[in-house]
Amino acid sequence: MVQRHPPGRPSPNRFPVAKTFTTPPHRNTTSPMHSLPKFVGALGLGLLITASTLQAATAPEGFQNLFNGTDLSGWEGNPKLWSVQEGTITGQTTAADPIKGNTFLIWKGGTVDDFELRFTYKIVPNNDQGFGNSGCQYRSKIADAGNFVVGGYQADFEAAKTYSGILYEERGRGILANRGQVTLVKPDPQSPGKTKIEVIGSVGKSEEIQAAIKDRDWNQYVVIAHGNRLLHIINGRVTVDVTDEQFTHAAKSGILAFQLHAGPAMTVQFKDVFLRPLK
């Protein structure tokens, strides 16, 4: 996510995902993903039933395993910052050698367009401020190959209690949905080239979604992108639902990457990284 300076950062109905997701008022039902509600319901049940299965390194049926559990084959990033520790992808910064900007571990298996991505993460702040921020880039682009810098859609998460689950566009339009929001992103008719974000519904209260996120422990994240509709889900709870109709900016495809955020010392870990295409 964007450079944040802890601790004073800007602050931004319970949603049972195993039930049918109802279309909020003014939802663009002509979206390529208008049939997603039924799929989300099925996904929620799958997450609840197979949670223990996702702890294994074996990919669920129909998914590709992006991490072999032993080394960073198929990934590229700064080797001083990224390694494999105890079978997990590990990114770590230190107080003695802080990084000056956000950097990323990039999946080299190609680009993704319409997909479901599942991964399990843990983030631990190694500092007095309790600061730690990371995320998963998707449909993104490499902005600086030499420094492993990426821009694009980001499924955000952090060690604090505000940003986990939001949709942020790294090196782009910024926050496209705060946690709990259903948003419609479109051009601002009053300011050509600018972005207008309309909140058209809710998937739940931010604090209730946060209560389902485990502190300094493993959490399951699911990202679904289909057409111009984007969903984030943590531990079976939908956190945002975004339809991006600013087509001059909305990415249809791009790379995947994990973020290591600049700032105080922190450790972020990933495992069980599974991908499947949606058609």
What does each model-identified segment do?
Residues 3-5, 26, 34:
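Low-complexity, intrinsically disordered or signal/transmembrane-proximal segments
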Residues 9-10:
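Short, low-complexity intrinsically disordered segments enriched in A/P/G/S/L with frequent Arg
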Residues 13-32:
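Short, Lys/Arg-enriched N-terminal segments with co-localized hydrophobic residues
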Residues 32-38:
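Positively charged n-region of N-terminal signal peptides that target proteins for export
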Residues 41-52:
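Bacterial N-terminal signal peptides
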